[in-house]
Design a protein with these regions (language model features):
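C-terminal transmembrane helical hairpin of 12-TM major facilitator-type secondary transporters
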Residues: 230-266
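Structural signature of the two symmetry-related core transmembrane helices
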Residues: 62-78, 231-246
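Helix-loop boundary and gating motifs at the non-cytosolic
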Residues: 1-41, 186-201, 297
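Intracellular juxtamembrane helix-capping segments at the cytosolic ends
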Residues: 95-110, 260-275
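Symmetry-related core transmembrane helices of the 12-TM Major Facilitator Superfamily/SLC fold
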Residues: 137-156, 304-324
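Extracytoplasmic gate region of multi-pass secondary transporters
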Residues: 16-21, 171-217
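A late C-terminal transmembrane helix in Major Facilitator Superfamily
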Residues: 275-310
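Central cavity-lining transmembrane alpha-helices of secondary-active solute carriers
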Residues: 34-56, 208-219
């Protein structure tokens, strides 16, 4: 199922990127392009926490969420509906898929590498779509076929998913509420920083950097499993620090790789802080990428400072989690 969800992620982002790019190349003015891209990001990323919360409460609907995602994305490819309607449909379909897929991966696997693999493919699909290297209909046909397989397997019970019951008392033995909230805030703060520093590519390398984004996410998950998340935090800092010591394409690639290595780490630790709501926590992390999408040109922090701030947020969050992770959720 991980392979299927990863392919779904690739095709979903490809659909959205291709449709929006097809509109942009025929639009003469920049303002409407910026508006509709911004609206898409707002819906696709800003609604995930709410959809995640609803699916956490009604887990039996998660298979249907994939179908609704397929329908809305298919409708979003119809240009006759108008770009406003298309943008809304694409945002909803994208949000539904990400939350449903992310929730399943968080529930089924307890390690980091699966998360890294799942989130890695979207950047490549998005780049192919935005650069019109693949048609939206091609992406859609693949997404439809894969989604029907996923829905069938979920309905037939072929997927072993651990469904945790909600803690009615919200009591965390050995993990004080203030420590949990502090850990979540710090981890989400790191995601905000990644939105500003880990997703921008050089236009001359339209496919190189999306592949680096993907490689960083996979590598981050593997490192967390092999050497632990604490050592991975240090490794990310060292890679980032070393990349700032000289100029050129290679240092930029290394820095981009390091920033993206944080993604599976933050997603998993945020989920561990509130394991009863994987969909909502996944959505909260996704929503924290919005500031980078909207205010990147207005936000100026020297790379050295950003690297240090990222390291401090991860280090303190990791310390809080290590100190208080001897907790037991009262189910």
């Amino acid at each position: 199922m991980l392979f299927l969800h990863t392919l779904q992620h690739f095709t979903v982002d490809g659909i959205c990127g291709a449709v929006l790019a097809a509109y942009a190349v025929n639009e003469s003015y920049f303002e409407p392009i910026a508006y509709y891209f911004g609206l898409y990001n707002l819906i696709a990323f800003g609604s995930q926490w709410l959809i995640g919360y609803l699916l956490d409460r009604k887990f039996n609907l998660i298979g249907h969420a994939f179908l609704v995602s397929l329908i809305t994305l298919a409708l979003g490819t119809i240009s006759e509906l108008g770009i406003l309607c298309q943008t809304i449909l694409l945002g909803i379909g994208n949000s539904l898929f990400h939350v449903a897929g992310g929730s399943l991966v968080l529930r089924k696997y307890k390690t980091y590498k699966e998360l890294g693999i799942f989130v890695s493919s979207g950047a490549i699909g998005l780049a192919l779509g935005l650069n019109l290297l693949c048609n939206a209909i091609v992406f859609l046909l693949f997404y439809a076929a894969i989604t029907l397989i996923v829905f069938y397997r979920l309905r037939r019970g072929h997927v072993d998913i651990e469904v945790q019951s909600e803690s009615r008392d919200n009591k965390y033995v050995g993990f004080p509420l203030i420590a949990m909230l502090g850990c979540i805030i710090l981890l989400l703060g790191c995601v905000v920083l990644r939105g500003f520093g880990g997703g921008n590519s050089v236009s001359d390398y339209v496919m190189l950097f999306p592949c680096v984004f993907a490689a960083g996410k996979v590598l981050g998950g593997i490192c967390c499993d092999k050497i632990g998340y604490k050592n991975t935090i240090i490794l990310i800092f060292l890679l980032s620090f070393l990349s700032l010591q000289w100029k050129g394409l290679i240092p930029i690639v290394i820095l981009t790789l390091a920033f993206n290595m944080t993604m599976p780490l933050t997603l998993r630790l945020v989920h561990f802080c509130n394991p009863n709501y994987p969909g909502m926590m996944f959505g909260l992390a996704a929503g924290c990428l919005l500031p980078g999408a909207f205010f990147h040109n207005d936000f100026s922090v020297i790379p050295q400072a950003m690297v240090v701030i990222q390291f401090l947020t991860l280090f303190i969050a990791g310390w809080l989690f290590k100190t208080y992770n001897q907790r037991q959720v009262v189910l």
